[in-house]
């Protein structure tokens, strides 16, 4: 299937202040957006794709000045793909607090003339959804045919169906969870601690020092990658294979240099991430993950939290995902069924762990394709 081709982001400016869940207010902010496909005359074929931790508005296609800059879900979104841009108008939004052009810690604080840094307020999934709703308003979209996301993106999709029930026809929630477990919060805390303890962090104001806390970011990403892969996947990819510069395959160096293939992989991923991502953004987004818990206001009762939803749902999980295990998706399914909502659920037997939602698995893509075929028939796309 062909790619959507060359795409270009656009920056949307919002003068009306946005009050955050914390009570802080962000004024005169901007959000970077990409769109794919055409909005029909009835404005009924719009789909919002919500991004996960380190992704962005750049969902599909490539940039003219960088043909290697393929969108993070290019295998899912495009002409003839499961989310077919010949039929749907797809929007990707870079969330507040991110580091890819939307207002965030790297932006200039108008009150000081300097980057916000650590002074940028903590944001939540709910704050992002409110900001995304303003994007929908700007496009004249009263109701999305679907809101879709994987992992943290799935949390946003679920939040949309809770916060704007009349504006979401279908919620597609993949490899996600209704709240983080204590173990997941612990992983995030270790990652944040690595960043906060980096001497180059400078209390979050490292921009003024001309440095980045790369060591902390590197470790944070390495921790994350361990949780994104399954044990079986890591065993198949790396096993206990050694990586030796001299070509020796069965001898140890008896040092603390990189010796195992899995060590090399983690360091490579950490180095790559530290080059392009912002540490303050990492702190913000992991805290937003921690805080997401729509049942909290209902004494932990997820069924009560979902009582006012109106959307139809597709919930999908992956058998080897231990970051957000299938049992967490089934919690959502049960709560929706308790409310007599229309729910489709699939647990896909895939070996790749949490990252499976990003990969080109035929069974998974066929599931999404079939569901969008149903939506297309409903909206005449």
Swiss-Prot record:
- Pathway(s) served: Amino-acid biosynthesis; L-methionine biosynthesis via de novo pathway; O-succinyl-L-homoserine from L-homoserine: step 1/1
Its BP terms in the Gene Ontology are: homoserine metabolic process; methionine biosynthetic process
Q: Which residues form the active site?
A: 151 (nucleophile), 321, 354
Q: What is its main location?
A: cytoplasm
Q: Which SUPFAM superfamilies match?
A: alpha/beta-Hydrolases
- Name the residues that bind substrate: 221, 355
Question: What are the subcellular locations of this protein?
Answer: Cytoplasm
Q: Which residues form the AB hydrolase-1 domain?
A: 45-360
The protein's UniProt keywords, in alphabetical order, are: Acyltransferase, Amino-acid biosynthesis, Cytoplasm, Methionine biosynthesis, Transferase
What is one term from the GO cellular component aspect held by the record? cytoplasm
Q: Would I find Nucleus among this entry's keywords? A: no
The record's catalysed reaction(s) read:
L-homoserine + succinyl-CoA = O-succinyl-L-homoserine + CoA
User: Taxonomically, which superkingdom?
Assistant: Bacteria
List residue numbers at the site (Important for acyl-CoA specificity). 323
A GO molecular function term, named singly, is: homoserine O-succinyltransferase activity
- Can you tell me which residues the record assigns to a coiled coil? none
Q: Does the keyword Membrane apply?
A: no
A Pfam short name: Abhydrolase_1
EC number(s): the record gives: 2.3.1.46
Family to which this protein belongs:
Belongs to the AB hydrolase superfamily. MetX family.
The record's subunit annotation is:
Homodimer.
Role noted for this protein: Transfers a succinyl group from succinyl-CoA to L-homoserine, forming succinyl-L-homoserine.
Protein's name according to its UniProt entry: Homoserine O-succinyltransferase
Organism of origin is Burkholderia multivorans (strain ATCC 17616 / 249)
